[in-house]
Amino acid sequence: MALQGSLSELSLPDVIQMVSVSGKTGVFEVSRSDEVGKIFLKDGQVVDALVGALHGDHAVYEMAIWSEGDFSFIPGEETDNVTIHLSNANLMMEAARRLDEWRVLSRKIPSLDLVPFFTSRDQSDQVTLSPHEWILVTRIDDEHTIEDIADTLHWS
């Protein structure tokens, strides 16, 4: 079963779900602009993925938020790497959750190429941060873009 299409027509989680139900082994090649990623299935189970410097489930989550680009499924191509140990259902649920989260964020942040910076505030203002938020704040340096920071923290 050769399958190909556009991510603007079908989301990657939906396409993976369709192919995985058939129990196929092969690879999804996913591309947009100058980025290319791969998601490997063995007997219908997602076992490995890579895009850029990301591997495993983080690579799947990154590609799942792509709304533009193309995909093709090449049956029979295998990998010896097993970097994903989640069930397809859990992997796709997390991908869908991140996609929903991304849709909300993308309305508030017009571009990942923006460089965040601190503004001066009255020192009497008290700010309370969670450990997760504190890690993020420590990466803001007036030089790196939102995308750079997300990549550094593996939050993309």
Briefly describe each language-model feature range.
Residues M1-S156:
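Acidic, Ser/Thr/Pro-enriched low-complexity segments and adjacent helix/loop capping patches
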